């Protein structure tokens, strides 16, 4: 009989306007009869008859005459009227005034106002099952729940970022459709209005819901899927409710401690009394009423720090309620406890979200009746690829900006020729660029995509850069003082206890954006860099530093000898020898501590003699984690130039701290003078590298992994004409998009291979003459394969693509995989399975299914790539010996 509104129990309690939760069961549809007659009249001209529906109208034997049809309508009305009176009498008998909307029936006769065409007949339908007892049962249940919870209804609804309910939600809810008026009551209208108001408040609040029902209600009423997924991912990376609370409380206490310690040490300590040595106790050096003597500049400094503290506390309080909702989402809907959250993989979480969406499609779509069509599509698209695009909508643009060197001219310091990017500058870039081109919902503004508004937008962005530069002039003094204190307190004790940390290295902020892949979530990227740090340090340390080692060994010998003498004299001398002053004001204890620290630093900085100098092997091993090995480095891995370029990416941590502090001073110059010059290039970048996807909105072109786009194809050869130059412009540098695609496949596992009968795009590309080199280059960069042929190198790795079809094995023989297992640590077993089968998982979504039929490639002849045999290097020699043994056997 058509698509009728399927009510749930909660929709019968709160009203159909809310329609909050999942469908209870198939029998619930029996009670959705408020629009029965309208639907009946709307569909009675349709033919042929449809299959029986759970909602049925009782009718007698089918008759083709108009008289019999009218009698059937009268019978239907009598049954409905009798049922209505039964419900009304039961509720009145129990002193319950309001009839739920889902139980309301039409008062008019079904044939009144009907425009049914003469000669048509009503489709037959089976008899209606008895529903009287069920109505009584649900009526009592609704009344019982309402009576038990009216006294405990919360006065306010928890507001959150993801699940924000409108403040006037209760006033927008429609009144109950039917209220029984007591004829004997004097104030009948007043009592009816009071009942209407109570029911409106009852439906507008969530106090009636259990934690599970509330979680389902919020899941079905998500209005901003980007923000919701960011909250879900933030809860995952924060390791659960307790860890997030402790972390944020700790951050607040650190700010409080720094503010208090700074104010106390700067104003409440008499340093003259302390340094003279006359003070013997704490009260002798404390200044009375010290805070009343604070200068105006100090008051401004503490006022800024106090404002930061207040903003952090406000942000913490606003997110506190959201954390509870996300906790219920994980614990109740996904079935993941906070303890398990610290060990479960993100791909498993994505799979659970996808299963939850599939099991609750109706509730998810019907939860918010005001959603647009695009919003409905967005809630249907929850594959791993779609979720990654939502979480990294802005980050993908940032990765592409550094990949295409859009900001390179502005961030290059004159006379230094070095990219200058720090965390503080990065924060200002996001504030000036991304907060300008994206709206409050996290979507790209339509004006950015209009070429006619290019100059106006560029002018506005130029003003934002200069305004930020002016503001940074006033904020720089306070920020410099704060960060000096913060870094001093953070690193001093670590360096004192472990002086070798002075020589520790870390990837710079510029390197992090340069090395990051498209759609690579932060925790996956951090894991990849952590695995590369040890090997990267080995690569740098193996370079000979003979002159430096000689100096360090000399200083270590002198300081170690002096410390040894002082320690021996301390043991043999009297008990006050440590207080003996070797120089004026400097005791033996001071020199033992100072010289001991110098000895430890020098000794830890001396290169070890047991390292083997093989920079190419080391750097290629690092490249399987960093996925970064420029063509310009080929054949020059042993040179100081390549080492210095790599050191700019993997710099000393102490230098990075100094650059962070220096950037606060240079920030006004970069923001006001350098960055405004690239405003037009930034606007052009967002317009030319954005693509709209139904259900996702505008995303970065490279993040969609589209390899077959005609207007923006992937190129592997140098540009020779204007068309090639244009295509080169629209292509990601360093084959980053292909590498990102392959790493994305590796990261999200190979569960549930999809049997679609369609060939993946990468597999099709691999058979094209111009594309095979591209994929091979990308995989060599992602693994331990040799990227350059013909270049002089000390180590050559045997794995090569022997077939144009990636469906065949990457390695020519299975024995080669076992032999070279230690050199392919960056490739998991799942990755090798991908490269052998290269089918796409249902977890990855439809973005990876591009539409050509699978072709039989088993009989394809080998092309020019078959001659890429690897015969050079030590490992190549081992491979040849291994093949020789096979021939002998």
From Swiss-Prot:
Q: Name one GO biological process term.
A: lipid transport
Spell out the reaction equation it catalyses.
a 1,2-diacyl-sn-glycero-3-phosphocholine(in) = a 1,2-diacyl-sn-glycero-3-phosphocholine(out); a 1,2-diacyl-sn-glycero-3-phospho-L-serine(in) = a 1,2-diacyl-sn-glycero-3-phospho-L-serine(out); a 1,2-diacyl-sn-glycero-3-phosphoethanolamine(in) = a 1,2-diacyl-sn-glycero-3-phosphoethanolamine(out); a 1,2-diacyl-sn-glycero-3-phospho-(1D-myo-inositol-3-phosphate)(in) = a 1,2-diacyl-sn-glycero-3-phospho-(1D-myo-inositol-3-phosphate)(out)
Q: Which GO terms describe its cellular component?
A: autophagosome; cytoplasmic vesicle membrane; endoplasmic reticulum membrane; Golgi membrane; phagophore assembly site membrane
The answer on whether this UniProt entry bears the keyword Transmembrane reads: yes
Start and end residues of each stretch annotated as Disordered: 41-77, 108-132
What does its PTM field state?
Phosphorylated by ATG1. ATG1 phosphorylation is required for preautophagosome elongation.
Intramembrane features from the record: 396, 652-672
Topological domains annotated Cytoplasmic: 1-248, 321-395, 397-468, 571-651, 673-889
Q: What is the membrane topology noted in the UniProt record heading this document?
A: Multi-pass membrane protein
Q: Out of the domains of life, which is the source? A: Eukaryota
Which keywords does the record carry?
Autophagy, Cytoplasmic vesicle, Endoplasmic reticulum, Golgi apparatus, Lipid transport, Membrane, Phosphoprotein, Transmembrane, Transmembrane helix, Transport
User: What ranges are annotated Lumenal (topological domains)?
Assistant: 270-299, 490-549
Pfam families in alphabetical order: ATG9
Reply yes or no: does the keyword Transmembrane apply. Answer: yes
* Matches recorded under InterPro entries: Autophagy-rel_prot_9 (IPR007241)
Cite the record's note on assembly.
Homotrimer; forms a homotrimer with a central pore that forms a path between the two membrane leaflets.
Q: What is this protein called?
A: Autophagy-related protein 9
The species is: Pichia angusta (Yeast)
Q: What is the lineage of its organism?
A: Eukaryota, Fungi, Dikarya, Ascomycota, Saccharomycotina
Give the gene that encodes this protein: ATG9
């Amino acid at each position: 009989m058509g698509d009728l509104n399927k009510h749930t129990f909660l929709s019968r309690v709160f009203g159909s306007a809310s329609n909050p939760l999942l469908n209870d069961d198939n029998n619930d549809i029996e009670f959705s009869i408020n629009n029965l007659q309208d639907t009946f009249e709307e569909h009675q001209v349709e033919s042929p008859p449809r299959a029986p529906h759970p909602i049925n109208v009782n009718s007698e034997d089918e008759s083709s005459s108009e008289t019999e049809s009218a009698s059937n309508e009268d019978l239907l009305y009598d049954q409905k009227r009798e049922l209505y009176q039964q419900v009304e009498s039961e509720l009145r008998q129990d002193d319950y005034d309001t009839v739920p909307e889902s139980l309301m029936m039409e008062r008019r006769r079904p044939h009144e106002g009907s425009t049914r065409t003469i000669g048509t007949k009503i489709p037959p339908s089976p008899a209606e099952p008895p529903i009287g007892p069920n109505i009584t049962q649900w009526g009592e249940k609704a009344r019982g729940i309402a009576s038990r919870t009216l006294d405990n209804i919360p006065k306010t609804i928890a507001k959150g970022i993801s699940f924000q309910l409108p403040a006037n939600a209760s006033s927008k809810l429609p009144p109950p459709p039917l209220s029984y008026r007591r004829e004997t009551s004097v104030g009948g209208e007043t009592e009816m209005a009071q009942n209407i108001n109570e029911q409106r408040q009852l439906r507008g609040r969530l106090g009636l819901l259990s934690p599970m029902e509330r979680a389902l209600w919020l899941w079905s009423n998500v209005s901003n899927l980007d923000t919701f997924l960011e909250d879900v991912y933030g809860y995952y990376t924060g390791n659960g409710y307790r860890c997030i609370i402790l972390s944020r409380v700790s951050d607040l206490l650190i700010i409080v401690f720094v503010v208090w310690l700074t104010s106390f040490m700067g104003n409440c300590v008499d340093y003259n009394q302390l340094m003279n040595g006359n003070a013997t106790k704490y009260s002798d050096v404390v200044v009375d009423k010290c805070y009343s003597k604070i200068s105006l500049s100090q008051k401004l400094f503490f006022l800024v720090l106090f404002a930061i503290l207040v903003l952090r506390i406000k942000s913490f309080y606003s997110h506190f309620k959201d954390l509870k909702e996300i906790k219920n989402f994980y614990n109740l809907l996904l079935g993941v406890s906070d303890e398990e959250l610290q060990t479960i993989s993100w791909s498993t979480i994505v799979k659970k979200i996808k299963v939850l969406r599939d099991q609750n499609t109706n509730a998810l779509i019907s939860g918010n009746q005001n959603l647009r069509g695009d919003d409905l599509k967005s809630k249907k698209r929850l594959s791993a690829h779609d979720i990654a695009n939502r979480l990294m909508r802005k980050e993908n643009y940032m990765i592409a900006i550094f990949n295409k060197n859009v900001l390179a001219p502005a961030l290059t310091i004159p006379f230094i020729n070095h990219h200058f990017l720090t965390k503080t500058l990065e924060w200002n870039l996001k504030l000036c660029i991304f907060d300008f081109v994206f709206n409050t919902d996290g979507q790209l503004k339509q004006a950015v995509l209009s070429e006619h508004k290019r100059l106006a937008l560029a002018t506005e962005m130029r003003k934002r850069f200069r305004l930020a530069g002016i503001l940074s002039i006033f904020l720089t003094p306070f920020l410099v003082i704060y960060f000096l204190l913060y870094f001093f307190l953070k690193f001093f004790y670590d360096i004192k206890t472990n002086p070798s940390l002075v020589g520790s290295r870390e990837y710079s902020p510029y390197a992090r954006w340069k090395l990051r892949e498209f759609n690579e979530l932060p925790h996956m990227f951090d894991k990849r860099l952590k695995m590369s740090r040890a090997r990267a340090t080995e690569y740098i340390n193996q370079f000979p530093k003979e002159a430096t080692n000689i100096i360090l060994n000399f200083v270590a010998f002198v300081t170690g000898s002096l410390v040894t003498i002082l320690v021996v004299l301390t043991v043999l001398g009297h008990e006050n020898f440590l207080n003996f002053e070797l120089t004026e004001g400097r005791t033996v204890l001071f020199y033992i501590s100072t010289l001991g620290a110098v000895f430890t630093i020098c000794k830890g900085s001396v290169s070890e003699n047991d390292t083997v100098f093989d920079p190419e092997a080391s750097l290629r091993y690092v490249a399987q984690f960093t996925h970064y090995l420029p063509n310009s480095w080929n054949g020059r891995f042993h040179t100081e130039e390549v080492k210095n370029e790599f050191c700019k990416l993997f710099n000393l941590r102490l230098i990075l701290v100094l650059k962070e502090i220096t950037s606060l001073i240079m920030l006004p110059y970069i923001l006001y003078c350098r960055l405004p010059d690239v405003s037009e290039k930034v606007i052009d970048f967002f317009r030319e590298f954005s693509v709209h996807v139904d259900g996702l909105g505008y995303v970065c072109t490279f993040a969609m992994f589209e390899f077959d786009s005609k207007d923006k194809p992937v190129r592997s050869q140098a540009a020779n004409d204007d068309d090639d130059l244009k295509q080169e412009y629209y292509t990601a540098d360093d084959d980053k998009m292909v590498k990102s695609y392959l790493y994305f496949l590796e990261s999200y596992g190979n569960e549930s291979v999809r049997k679609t009968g369609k060939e993946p795009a990468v597999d099709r590309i691999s058979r094209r003459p111009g594309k095979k080199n591209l994929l091979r280059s990308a995989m060599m960069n992602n693994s331990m394969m040799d990227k350059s042929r013909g270049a002089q190198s000390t180590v050559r790795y045997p794995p090569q693509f022997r077939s144009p079809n990636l469906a065949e094995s990457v390695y020519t023989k299975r024995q080669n995989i076992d032999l070279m297992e230690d050199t392919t640590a960056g490739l998991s077993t799942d990755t090798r399975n991908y490269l052998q089968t290269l089918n796409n998982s249902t977890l990855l979504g439809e973005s990876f299914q591009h539409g050509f039929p699978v072709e039989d490639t088993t009989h394809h002849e080998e092309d020019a790539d078959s001659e890429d045999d690897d015969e050079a290097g030590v490992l190549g020699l081992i491979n040849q010996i291994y093949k020789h043994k096979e021939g002998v056997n």
